[in-house]
Each structure stands twice: as C-alpha cells, then as structure tokens.
Curated annotation (Swiss-Prot):
Site positions for Involved in the stabilization of negative charge on the oxyanion by the formation of the oxyanion hole: T121, G122
Pathway assigned in UniProt: Amino-acid biosynthesis; L-arginine biosynthesis; L-ornithine and N-acetyl-L-glutamate from L-glutamate and N(2)-acetyl-L-ornithine (cyclic): step 1/1; Amino-acid biosynthesis; L-arginine biosynthesis; N(2)-acetyl-L-ornithine from L-glutamate: step 1/4
A Pfam family of this chain: ArgJ
Alphabetized GO MF terms: glutamate N-acetyltransferase activity; L-glutamate N-acetyltransferase activity
Active site: T193
Keyword flag NAD: no
Annotated protein name in UniProt: Arginine biosynthesis bifunctional protein ArgJ
Enzyme Commission code: 2.3.1.35, 2.3.1.1
Recorded catalytic activity of this chain's protein: N(2)-acetyl-L-ornithine + L-glutamate = N-acetyl-L-glutamate + L-ornithine; L-glutamate + acetyl-CoA = N-acetyl-L-glutamate + CoA + H(+)
GO cellular component: cytoplasm
C-alpha cells in the first residue's frame, strides 16, 4: 500500500472527462436495440499513454490495433469504444474493421490514426456492423458531451455506470485523475469483459506511467473476480495530457508517491465497482489476507477465496461455512501451516489452531446479510498482505448467462 498524506488527495464527484483538456461522448448507433453503444474520449492534445491488456491467447482485433498505436509513440489523443460486439475471433475482417474504426475516428478529429486507440466489448464471434459504426462516428462529431453518456455507451450486462475521480496536489498544482470502467460478467482479468479508461491532466514521463499502471493493475483490476473467466478484450488504458501544468513527474520526483497513490485509488475504486456489479450479484465480497509469505502469495490466497464458487454461494445463502474458505486456502499453492491460520468474519473468529472456534451463527448470519462482506485471513507465515474483491453467486447469474444472446 502506498502511504501519503490524506490532505494531498481528495475524492470528487467528477468523471473521466473532469481532468483538464478532456471530453467524453456517447451515442446510440444501432449496435444495441435502443441504448447508447458507441463512445469516445478525446484529449485536446496528444497525451502520454500506457495500457495493459488481456493475457488471453484469443486477443480481440481492437487490442491488436491499440497495441500498434501505442507502440509507435506511446501517445494517444482519443479512444473509440463500442459495446454489443467484441469484434473478437473475427479473423482478417475483424482486424480490417478495427483499423477502419481507428481511421474514421482520426479523420473525424483531424489527427493521425496512430493517436487513436480502439476498444470493443460484447458478443464474441460476430462481425461488426460497420455501417452502424460509420453512422455512429458521424453522430459523435455532431453530439455535445453530456455527463454519463460515455460511461453508458460502453456497458453490456452492467446494471450501473462506473466512474470515479480524485484531485491531487502536485508541486502546488491541482492534478485530476478521472476514470470510467465497464464489467459485470466474465471478470477474472490478468492483464470481462473488463475495460478501464483513466485520464489525467498530469505531466508525466512515459516509462514511469507504464510501470505505475502495470504495478497498480496487479493489485486492483487483477484482484477482482466475478465468474473466473478472462475475456478476449480486457484492457486498462491511461492517458496523461499534461494540461495541469505541473513539473514533469518521474519515479524520483518528490510528489511521485502522491500521483501513484491517486492512480491506485482510481483503479481500486473502479475495480470494486465492477466486482459489486457482478451479474446477478447482491453483495460485494472483500477478502483481506495478512501475514502471508509475500505480498504475491497474499494476493493469490485472497483471489482464490473470493473466486471460489462455494464461498460465493455460501455468502449468498448467508451461511458462515468457514470450511469452504479453508478449502480455497489449501488449494492456493501458497505457503500454509494449518495450525497458524486464522479466519475472521464480521469481527468473529471462526477458525484458529487448525480447529473450529465457538462463534454466534446468528451474528454471522446477520453480518452476511449486509451488502458488503469482509473475510479476514491471518497466515502467520511472513509480512505479505493482499486484498481481492468479488461478489456472491446467485440464481440470477445463471439466468442472465443462459440467455445472453437471446
């Protein structure tokens, strides 16, 4: 955890369009029946940019096009995103369509194609309706920015938009970091579809931004799970356009920890919003592991627990079945000494010294009825700490995914 003064960072009611020099739009172009389905984020000038991508062998066409754009100069000025269609597993035609989305967006803005990132989310294995995309890009050119339109345009089975914003003080200058995300099902990212877009007006060194994003993604977006599946389209992208006018940030700068903490808060906030909005979910589950052999092992254990379908269903059924947590810990391949492990729920110790502990089933059940549930695990193997987030598994999840294409 990055430690900085709370006075230097504050959360605001802003969005991905709040940092200086950005605007965001969303329109309905016909990929979905009636809801918005095409969005764009635009920076007033080229922004230093970084991204992390899905580790799936079946990377979607837009991922490949965005990687190519960033490889050229590590700068972007826009990102175009469609929902309802992932443009994944669509062969050469899918790649051509992604390039065409990039070209049309660049022409609309009067910029080079390499300054545009492309992202898609939705059904896998169907070709994009480029007639609708072309119409949508024309609509974006004519449409005025409106709060929440971009965030709505990138949703699929999500039930709510996901956005956040923080303000920081860097060298006496106000710096803003905003973010938007989508994700509800198929969430088990290892950089689901899980998409995250972060904007900042900070001036920052390219390599420092990429390293920070990679490190922070590992403890935020990569620590959430809804159903254990990794998508073909997962991506987290950050743009930094320098409009705040701060002294250029790098890893040795005295205010680097402040910026890095702000970025971590934005990514963690978005990750938790995704976990909370898991398909059919009624509860956010947080698992905190302390005393593991290393931070990595703590993260592995936490994610193993929160990803267990048995744990998820127990939480849904308000059943303090700690045996399911033990099973997940034992299956994590981390260093485990059973006699040292302690499991706590709602302030009650359920398991310690490799044996059950007396606890109130009634109090545990009442605690599990909350919309947020925290499971604490103490390993006593070292100093490692890790947290993961997920949601309960309900009948509604099966219902949603049984009829996803109908």
């Amino acid at each position: 955890m990055i430690q900085v003064s709370q006075d230097s960072i504050k959360k605001t009611d802003g969005s991905v369009a709040s940092p200086k020099g950005y605007l965001a739009k969303g329109v309905h172009c016909g990929l979905r029946y009636s809801k918005k389905d095409l969005g764009i984020i635009i920076s007033s000038r080229p922004a230093v940019s970084a991204a992390v991508y899905t580790q799936s062998h079946f990377q979607a066409a837009p991922i490949k096009v965005t990687q190519e754009s960033l490889k050229k100069s590590a700068h972007l000025q826009a990102v175009i995103v469609n929902s309802a269609n992932a443009n994944a597993c669509t062969g050469e035609q899918g790649l051509k369509d992604a390039y065409e989305m990039r070209r049309q967006s660049a022409d609309m803005l009067g910029i080079e194609p390499d300054l545009v990132a492309v992202s898609s989310t939705g059904v896998i294995g169907e070709y994009l309706n480029m007639e609708n995309i072309t119409k949508g890009i024309s609509l974006l050119a004519e449409t005025e920015p409106a709060e929440g339109d971009f965030e709505e345009a990138i949703l699929t089975t999500d039930t709510v938009i996901k956005q956040t914003c923080y303000e920081l003080m860097i060298g006496g200058q106000k710096v803003t970091i905003g973010g938007a995300a989508k994700g509800s099902g198929m969430i088990h990212p290892n950089m689901a579809t899980m998409l995250g877009f972060v904007t900042t007006d900070a001036c920052i060194e390219e390599s420092a931004l990429q390293r920070a994003l990679r490190e922070i993604t590992d403890v935020s977006f990569n620590q959430i799970t809804v159903d254990g599946d990794t998508s073909t389209n997962d991506m987290v992208l950050v743009m930094a356009n320098g409009c705040a006018g701060n002294e250029r940030l790098h890893e040795e700068h005295e205010d680097w920890p402040v910026f890095k903490k702000g970025l971590q808060l934005v990514c963690t906030d978005l990750a938790k919003q995704i976990a909370r909005d898991g398909e059919g979910a009624t509860k956010l589950i947080e698992v905190e592991v302390n005393g593991a052999k290393s931070n990595l092992e703590a993260q592995i254990i936490a994610k193993k627990i929160v990803g267990s379908n048995l744990v998820k269903t127990a939480v849904y059924g308000t059943d303090a079945n700690w045996g399911r947590i033990v099973v997940a810990i034992g299956d994590s391949m981390a260093a485990v000494t059973p006699e040292k492990v302690e499991i706590r729920l709602g302030g009650q110790c359920l398991f310690k010294n490799n044996e059950p502990q007396p606890f109130s089933e009634e109090l545990a059940k009442t605690y599990l009825e909350n919309s947020e549930v925290k499971i604490e695990v103490f390993m006593q193997e070292g100093e490692g700490k890790g947290t993961a987030w997920g949601c309960d598994l309900t009948y509604e999840y099966v219902k949603i995914n049984a009829s996803y294409r109908t």
